Amino acid sequence: MIISVKEIKKFIICVLIPILIGYLSFLISTLISQTSFEIQYLQLIKPDFAPSSDVFQIVWPILYVLMGISYYIVIKSQKSTQKIKEASFFYYLQLALNFLWSVLFFGFNLRFVALVEIFILMLILMAMIYTFFNVNVKAALLNVPYLIWITYAMVLNYFIWILNK
């Protein structure tokens, strides 16, 4: 199977978009708060099950790559345009919410607002996985680790909010 340069570019763009959005969210959060993510995270009172800040720097890039690959699979599928549009809507909506969470939590220190927002993100992510499933099962399954991580992050967000009131 020969893959065109155009397809390789499309794949790379699909993978880079979530990575860049994630990077920008942490950059903007740092600019707003004038403190890096690592320093803020270290200063928080956290529950015993909270990971070290290094874990986030490993997990998020992996999740962003999986998101990008899954979206590429969706847009390359032979399913109806309507199904792809619906999946794309939820994909970009969850990316926007993903971006916003870091700004709320780290940029503005709005822990409770971030908690509400991550709950909405989790619901939108479930809708995205469902719409991806209707297009391509593998694309949907690639996002299950993301859903698990977001659920964990939501629980962590809750306890950090409670412990740091």
Question: In which residue ranges do the predicted regions lie?
Answer:
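Interfacial helix-start motif at the membrane-water boundary
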Residues: 47-65
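Core segments of transmembrane alpha-helices
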Residues: 60-72, 94-97, 121
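Membrane-interface helix caps and helix-loop-helix hairpins in membrane proteins
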Residues: 101-113, 161-165
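Non-cytosolic membrane-interface motifs at loop->transmembrane helix junctions
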Residues: 107-120, 141-142
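Perimembrane loop-to-helix junctions flanking transmembrane segments
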Residues: 37-50
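Membrane-interface helix-boundary motifs at transmembrane edges
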Residues: 2-6, 75-85, 133-141
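Terminal transmembrane helical module of multi-pass membrane proteins
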Residues: 131-165
